[in-house]
């Protein structure tokens, strides 16, 4: 009766088939858990480091995917509008302020009649803040890269010490003890392998992030120079000298 109900359920709702765990997964899960426990206590901090690395990778991936997908369109819209109307360009940048490039372009556009130097300083100050946000998570990844192999090595050393302490070296040692020693050494090396895998993954993520940050620095510099050039050529009007300065200059003449 129960089997008939299951068949009817899967026939009416095929999506349940994809939700059901596969037999391979069910058989491999206890084996993976056993291998994890064989590594000893050091495997738990390695597990924590792997979770931190994965979390950082997903968070940074979400940040960069949003920025890279939308920034080109935002830049084109702002620069095209800046040639005709700075107010419209400011509104477009304001609408995109959830992105780093939007905040970067908005900083000089919200100033009232700035000089070119002030215009550039506003972009540079905002760029420094945005680059600091882009580097978020780098220190954590660097720590994981350095710490994970050391933890793996520590687990291997403690495992080897535990293995050799259990051997009866003075008694000559039997074949069973030799087999047990070989098994213990193999289990001790699990932590080294785990530490290396965590460090390699963190290193790959870190290098990708550093590459993206370098590209964005060049991109921000190019976009900022283009916006500043538009402002200088189209909108900037040098202020006339104040009357009192003109008077002082005439008095100073011989």
Curated annotation (Swiss-Prot):
The membrane topology noted for this protein in its Swiss-Prot or TrEMBL record is: Multi-pass membrane protein
Entry keyword set: Cell inner membrane, Cell membrane, Membrane, Protein transport, Transmembrane, Transmembrane helix, Transport
Q: Where is the protein localized?
A: Cell inner membrane
InterPro entries, per the entry: ExbB/TolQ_transport, MotA_ExbB_proton_chnl
Q: Which GO terms describe its biological process?
A: protein import
Q: Which GO terms describe its cellular component?
A: plasma membrane
Spans traversing the lipid bilayer: 39-59, 141-161, 185-205
Q: What role is this protein assigned?
A: Involved in the TonB-dependent energy-dependent transport of various receptor-bound substrates. Protects ExbD from proteolytic degradation and functionally stabilizes TonB.
Write out the similarity annotation.
Belongs to the ExbB/TolQ family.
Protein's name in the database: Putative biopolymer transport protein ExbB-like 1
Organism in which the protein naturally occurs: Synechocystis sp. (strain ATCC 27184 / PCC 6803 / Kazusa)
Q: Lineage, please? A: Bacteria, Bacillati, Cyanobacteriota, Cyanophyceae, Synechococcales
